[in-house]
Amino acid sequence: MRDGTPRANRLWGRLLVEELLRCGVGLFCVAPGSRSTPLVAAIAEHPRARALVHYDERGTAFAALGYARATGRPAAWVTTSGTAVANGLPAVAEAATDCVPMLLLTADRPPELRHTGANQTIEQPGIFGGYARWSFDVPPPGPDQDPATVLTTVDQAVYRSQRPPAGPVHLNLMFREPFLPQPAQPDGLPDLWPGDGPYTRYARAAPVPDEAEVRELASALGAAERGVVVAGRLRSRKQGEAAARLAAALGWPLLPDICSQARLGARPEVSAPYHDLLLAGGRFPGGRAPDAVVRVGGVPVSKRLQRYVTGRKPATYAVVADHPFRSDPEHLATHRLEADVAELCAALAGRVRRAAAPGWLSGWLRASGEAGRRLEAALRERKGLSEPGVARLVSRLIPEDHALVAASSMPVRDLDTFADPEGPPVPVAANRGASGIDGTVATAAGFARGAGRPVTLLIGDLALLHDLNSLAMLRGLPAVVVVLNNDGGGIFHFLPVAEHGGIFEPYFGTPHGLGFRQAAEMFGLGYSGPRTAGELSLAYQRACAEGGPHLIEVVTDRRENLALHRELLRGAAG
């Protein structure tokens, strides 16, 4: 059997790659390794296979995640055996938590080498636990195996990664040595396909709520005088627009999260984009909490918004999402509807009657506009650069053809609170499923490739240090990295632990004393270090126009940042 092993490996690898391409997989994120040779060779030799090769498995996994965030389709993460596989867990956890499709193709030793002490062998089947939507341990290629089993396994994997709830799917692929035959013209593939598409065509599944449930919810919403529509994390501008139309039909304000695809380019006739500023003052338009809430999409970034909509249990609290998970940390939901978000919002908008209290919507819009004007005036009075000011400037100046990726921690929060709603309606992405700071640069690299757009990344210094080697994936991309370097963990200054001076700075503030000029030079990025808002505007616009990867470093002070946030929130709240 060993005489036929190299040819069987080559055939298996080529069948896998061909079928993945037929299923619409548009990117292979590859980390070099030996055991995955049959797969990698097939990717390299296929004229339609598009590959991103990077030397860090954690980075390539996050790049696959970013690609899927942009496209809604899975990329294939390809890795060798051993601890290389374990490096995918952070991205897998994020993808599973936020229902992002992902294909995990991990090479492994054959059965006779497991649990023997063989080199670079760990327990790979089941390694991703409950985060994998489906896992399959694929046996080694052999002459007695039907090649069609490869195709149907791939088809099932791609389908399971995208059907609700979307998420990671793991194919653990065993290969025996030798991995490839001697270099020669490869044999043609067997004639297994009836046409140009995949071997097995899966019809797309989409949950459809019961019509009676939709009517009942529409009736409950129509009876509420003071309601709000909260647009949480959404996957497309179409979904954000559908949420806005539902709010308009109800006569309620839309409170959009930065990742709702409705916060930038907000619709002024229905959107209250500065809701976080308003709620910071503890005063609500209309003087009371809502009696009905529709949350569309994921849990929003703003804790103040969450406290507002849940502080007094609403009579109706509906959660609409395209997955079956609970998504209700306060345990207040009265209605939970799983469906295509845009379609369900349209269905509700066509059935509700408008019973909003007079002045409810206009009060929200007026208060939000006033908060925005106070914020603008306060930031204009400041001469130096600040983290809120940088977030606002980027949201205003980002070109319409860009995408915006925000790191978790302070950047996504500052964009949520301070972004200019009149900025271009660009796609916005952040890893807010599990909300880790790891893999942010790699996510942006994958997102840019998936969206087919230049990308602007707003990131903090610790998140950039955490994923520094992923800057290599930005080579050749029109990418602008804006890093806010406050020499440590700025977000911890907003938490009660900041009062514990003896332990705070060494264990939470964690100053590092590092700058990023040399990192930009090492990875081939242009560099700017602006000190004023004017310099930042020029540097950012120049970097966007030049098109190559560029890093802009803005140095700030953590304590000053805390004081400024408090000042802006007090002032904008009125």
UniProtKB/Swiss-Prot annotation:
Disulfide bonds: none annotated. Catalyzes the thiamine diphosphate-dependent decarboxylation of 2-oxoglutarate and the subsequent addition of the resulting succinic semialdehyde-thiamine pyrophosphate anion to isochorismate to yield 2-succinyl-5-enolpyruvyl-6-hydroxy-3-cyclohexene-1-carboxylate (SEPHCHC). Keywords: Magnesium, Manganese, Menaquinone biosynthesis, Metal-binding, Thiamine pyrophosphate, Transferase. Its EC number is 2.2.1.9. It comes from the Bacteria. Belongs to the TPP enzyme family. MenD subfamily. The keyword Signal does not apply. It is an enzyme of class 2 (transferase). It catalyses: isochorismate + 2-oxoglutarate + H(+) = 5-enolpyruvoyl-6-hydroxy-2-succinyl-cyclohex-3-ene-1-carboxylate + CO2. Its cofactor is Mg(2+); Mn(2+); thiamine diphosphate. One of its GO terms (biological process) is menaquinone biosynthetic process. Pathway: Quinol/quinone metabolism; 1,4-dihydroxy-2-naphthoate biosynthesis; 1,4-dihydroxy-2-naphthoate from chorismate: step 2/7; Quinol/quinone metabolism; menaquinone biosynthesis. Gene3D superfamilies: 3.40.50.970, TPP-binding domain. Homodimer. Binds 1 thiamine pyrophosphate per subunit. Pfam families: TPP_enzyme_C, TPP_enzyme_M_2, TPP_enzyme_N. This is 2-succinyl-5-enolpyruvyl-6-hydroxy-3-cyclohexene-1-carboxylate synthase. InterPro entries: DHS-like_NAD/FAD-binding_dom, MenaQ_synth_MenD, MenD_middle, THDP-binding, Thiamin_PyroP_enz_TPP-bd_dom, TPP_enzyme_TPP-bd. GO terms for molecular function: 2-succinyl-5-enolpyruvyl-6-hydroxy-3-cyclohexene-1-carboxylic-acid synthase activity; magnesium ion binding; manganese ion binding; thiamine pyrophosphate binding. HAMAP family: MenD.
